Amino acid sequence: MAMPLCSLTSYNPITTTLRGHHFLTINAYVKTQCIPCFFIKLHTRSSGSKQRIIDLRSGSSNIVACVGEGATSLSSHSDIMKTAKREEIPPGVWKDDISDSIMSSHKPEADEKRVEILIAEIKSMFRGMGDGETTPSAYDTAWVAKIPALDGSDHPHFPQTLQWILQNQLQDGSWGEGTYFSTYDRLLATLACIITLTVWRTGQTQVRQGIEFFRKHAGTMEDEADNHQPIGFEFVFPAMINEAKSLCLDLPYDTPFIKQIIEKREAKLKMIPTDTLYTVPTTFLYYLEGLQEIIDCQKIIKLQSKDGSFLSSPASTAAVFMCTGNTKCLEFLNFVLIKFGNHVPCQYPLDLFERLWAVDIVERLGIDRHFKKEIKDALDYVYSHWDERGIRWARENPVAYIDVMATGIRILRLHRYNVSSDILKTFRDENGEFYRFPGQSERGVTDMLNLNRCSHVAFPGETVMEEAKLCTERYLWNALENVNPLDKWGLKENIRGEVEYALKYPWLRRLPRLETRNYIEHYGANDVWLGKMMHMMPYINDRKYLELAKLDFNNVQSIHQKELRELRRWWKSSGFAELNFLPDRVAEIFFSIASSMFEPELATCRAVYTKSTLCTVILDGFYDVHGSAEDIMLFNEAVKRWDHSLLDRMAEHIKTCFLALYNVVNEIAEEGRKRQGHDVLPYIRNLWEIQLESFTKEAEWSRAEHVPSFHEYIEAAAISSALPTLVLIGVIFTGEVLTDHILSQIDYRSKFAYLMSLTGRLANDTKTYQVERGQGEVASAIQCYMKENPELSEEEALEYIYRLMENALADFKCEFLNTKDVPEYCRRLVFDNARSMQLIYMEGDGFKLSHETEIKQHVKKILFEPVA
């Protein structure tokens, strides 16, 4: 019978068989007077137990009882079988002179002053965030300008707005957003302005030019995509056409499109549920100026926002004020004009929207480390306005918008704020489909893309997030079938590229520098937002962000190139390159750490991680393929002694492996002593002994052609994956003094580290088991599971392993989001190790076969190719 998934994703302290009769148990938690320890018990079935405690702080290594003499020998096969298992080494990807060729002419020091200026300017933007910066709306300004003077005189109450209209007509005779031409936007704004000028009997020249523009372009509206229609266009445009008729303006009223939109409005007006129109805030509040003949203005006042507006819309608020004289409406309009002077935007405030999007931009562009305080201040502000209804685009806004809600949930969760996803249920219909606003049936590419991103930070059991993931994936794949996928609330030049990237590389396959490089290529500094009118938001779309991101990326890449050149020199001097165990994969392995732990101050962490990984890969090949049983026993003994006393008994390839490991570990330990303030050599040696014992066990399985139980294999994989070893060495160099509490959350005692190892091993197995089986490897997750479930086909077993991995990844993600009191770099090292494995084994063995997978292109983009 197939094992239930839940039985393997639950966490237990790790117990695995190592070196024949010995068992390794990693205790779930050990505390000895708050001194950080790495606590390991070695048991035998015969003569009691032995116990070794490695104290990271003191560096002492106390053997409570000796490990025992004479480990059981490994089963030996013939040298012929050993040779048969050796795989043909894939070709190297990078040329021998790569060290010189990768060194770009980029000089980071030349950019330092400009970088400092940009950082200061962006910090100033964050500090200056109030209720939101946005561009003028000619349409809304025209509505405000229509308000007559309160003293009854024949003048506008806000004469400055009328002057703005007279002074801001575009050269073609239209009004509207000048940076992007949309027929809908221009005609709606132009119609509003010529009506207002006609009402006040001024600007005859501007009116004539506006009418000429309108007549010229009215017939082309039917050619523009429906997705470019402003929100509420089908209500406000026909209403204004009727007003233009009453003013005897010479417009082409018989144009087919105008007739169609009027008919469409009449049909929609009949469908409006008048019983709920005055009881529940809806998007109708956003365009009340287009519904004046059907609404009771006195009743609608009940849905007025606390700030006096109707859904933050100056036009809608102005229309209600002219109908009711409500003083709160006037207070809101005065408030907006105090901010903007002689014009108004299409909606205001936008305080929550602006802060969330600014944080999202600097994070996705990879420059967030320069703005830690600003980000925290912005998110504290956003979270202070989170309630049981979630958040809106503005603090007083009564209508929920899924784009803001989804983005808020994702960003706040990633920053450890406690927010619930239950609010997303209000956007879901009975068929499990999600829409932009509750109870409505419109949605756009950006809405669904941000909801999809949100769904990836789900906790186990959050059904609504899983439903959102499935719904958005369907929608986005369908959107890609269009030649030019269009968005409803934004005109983005690179929306297709963003969607393709998000679908191909979900969050758990996405490394920070790849995300940065991709977003630099897709960020639109000139993107236009589409609400009731087109508008731009300068604190969200600003070329300063992009300029800093490019400079920063190239500066960091230049640092990484220098590090890679030194690592390649070390690789050649170590003797590893001559062993023919592995092709030159220094760049790929360095990429796996540099694409996540990329900050300049983590240079030592990257070097240590890369060297340790190369040692691990080489030794895995030695134990697995290139070493005899006797070779392995000799090597293990040499590592235990940690001296040169056995070198004379070693073959050259064994000697090379040992000396390289010996020198690397001693070098790392010396640097670690400086960082941690005490001797860490016993700690690091102990990690390697554990690692090599796991390699020994797997070699024993292979030589005996033994397929272990699935449970035994999975438990052993927690160590044999080598990920804990690499993380626990690398974490020494993240700038933190390691306490027992920190270690307990990321070492073998933690579920976090266990799931990192498990998911990494399963990702590896699913893409390598067939090749390794052909080389004589008999133990993999797939084969072990099939042994216990012989009724299953290989495809069914593989499908089970994929499901197991997905469940484990969900738990792992939860651990990452919930891990408390662990420094950011430590958490990231664990989390991004797991993500790196998911990416590298996405198509195949991305380390060994990088020349055949996309990994080569990723390496080039992150390490070799600067952004232009």
Swiss-Prot record:
Picking any one GO molecular function of the record gives: magnesium ion binding
As cofactor, the record names: Mg(2+)
Which cysteines form disulfides?
Answer: none
Origin species: Pinus contorta
- Tell me the organism's taxonomic lineage: Eukaryota, Viridiplantae, Streptophyta, Embryophyta, Tracheophyta
What does the UniProt function comment say about this protein? Answer: Involved in defensive oleoresin formation in conifers in response to insect attack or other injury. Involved in diterpene (C20) olefins biosynthesis. Monofunctional enzyme lacking the DXDD motif in the class II active site relevant for the cyclization of geranylgeranyl diphosphate (GGPP). Requires (+)-copalyl diphosphate ((+)-CPP) as substrate, but no activity with GGPP or ent-CPP. Pimaradiene is the major products of the enzyme.
Q: What is this protein called?
A: Monofunctional pimaradiene synthase
Could you tell me the superkingdom of the organism this chain comes from? Eukaryota
Q: Name one GO biological process term.
A: diterpenoid biosynthetic process
